[in-house]
Amino acid sequence: ALGDGVLDAKTKELIALGMAITARCVYCIGIHVEKSLRAGVSHAEIVEVCKVAIVMGGGPAMTYIAEVKKALDLFEQAHA
């Protein structure tokens, strides 16, 4: 379901990340940050997804942006 189709895998991972943030799923956020980066998503694109998730999910979603940052940091450390 997350591979290339009418929407490419990169776009689907961005959608999945936004949904993970609004669902407040720490595990899902970590997985989809990693999969997004592996699919070629930029940090700027992840930041934009975070902004959309905050608009859609409000304050509760905002608190989970820290989990996105943690996942980005872990990915960078593992691939430095």
Give the predicted meaning of each segment.
Residues 1-13, 61-80:
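Acidic, glycine/proline-rich low-complexity segments that act as flexible tails and inter-domain linkers
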Residues 10-14, 43-49:
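Alpha-helical scaffolds flanking conserved acidic
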Residues 15, 19-31, 56:
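Short, thiol/selenol-centered motifs that function as redox-active sites or metal-ligating centers
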Residues 17, 48-62, 75:
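N-terminal hydrophobic signal/anchor transmembrane helix of membrane proteins
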Residues 31-46, 69-72:
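Iron-sulfur (Fe-S) cluster-binding segments and ferredoxin-like electron-carrier domains
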